[in-house]
A protein has these predicted regions:
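Active-site anion-handling motifs in enzyme catalytic cores
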Residues: 1-230
């Protein structure tokens, strides 16, 4: 039985947004992505690599040898990926992940490079675009077209991100919303209470803080709920 399971085992790499961050939203999204990947690949060898820290050679080798590598949510894409490194990756890193096990002499063989690209699948899983920005730079277009798989569908969290990728020539993309929402089936939603509770959970954004508006919101919540959790 174990031998049969190992035959179906897939090496799955997760670009994990929770490494080197205190943003609790990233943990929620990462957990949702893990549930999705477990459903798709019940038997898997799972490896997590960072998105906020630059990848080591070991991490890049894991990506290059994986059956699939998934970018687990959050707004990692940006219009200027040279300067705004929400996803801390460079063009050279992208090439290393997709061609790293080729010998230097083989890098001149475009057939081998094409075959290697076809074997390395880096796929977006509910990923979004950082804020609302100007048109993407030529560097951003090049790095994303080098990084992202051209065979499988990419899942992005909103229509804005999908349109950005379409304009870059990346057409195998669907607007699926955030993976945290994928479990909100009709049956699940029917179980959600419709009456007002006595306790409420809220969050505050630290990287775009608005102290005055935050204080107004917290005051209002304290007025209407017995307990407020932040």
């Amino acid at each position: 039985m174990m031998d049969q399971e190992m035959q179906h085992c897939r090496k799955i790499v997760r670009f994990d947004p929770t490494i080197s961050t205190a943003n609790q939203g990233d943990f929620i999204i990462r957990n949702a992505c893990e549930h999705v990947l477990h459903d798709c690949f019940p038997v898997q060898l799972s490896v997590a690599v960072p998105v906020r820290d630059r990848l080591s050679k070991v991490s890049m080798k894991h990506v290059g040898s994986a059956d699939y590598a998934f970018v687990c949510g959050t707004n990692l894409l940006s219009s200027d990926m040279r300067r705004q490194r929400m996803w801390n990756i460079r063009l050279r890193d992208a090439l290393m992940m997709r061609c790293g096990d080729l010998h230097k002499r083989e890098l001149l063989n475009f057939r081998l490079i094409r075959e290697k690209f076809q074997r390395t699948h880096i796929i977006l899983l509910g990923t979004g675009w950082y804020q609302y920005q100007d048109e993407p730079t030529g560097y951003t277009k090049r790095i994303l077209k080098t990084l992202l798989d051209g065979q499988y569908l990419h899942a992005v969290r909103d229509e804005y991100t999908r349109q950005r990728l379409l304009k870059l020539g990346i057409t195998n993309v669907l607007n699926t919303a955030c993976p945290t929402m994928w479990g909100l089936t009709a049956d699940k939603c029917a179980q959600i209470p419709t009456h007002k509770a006595e306790r409420v959970v809220t969050t505050l954004t630290d990287y775009r803080s608005s102290p005055e508006q935050d204080a107004q919101m917290l005051t209002m919540l304290q007025k209407h709920y017995r307990e407020v959790y932040v």
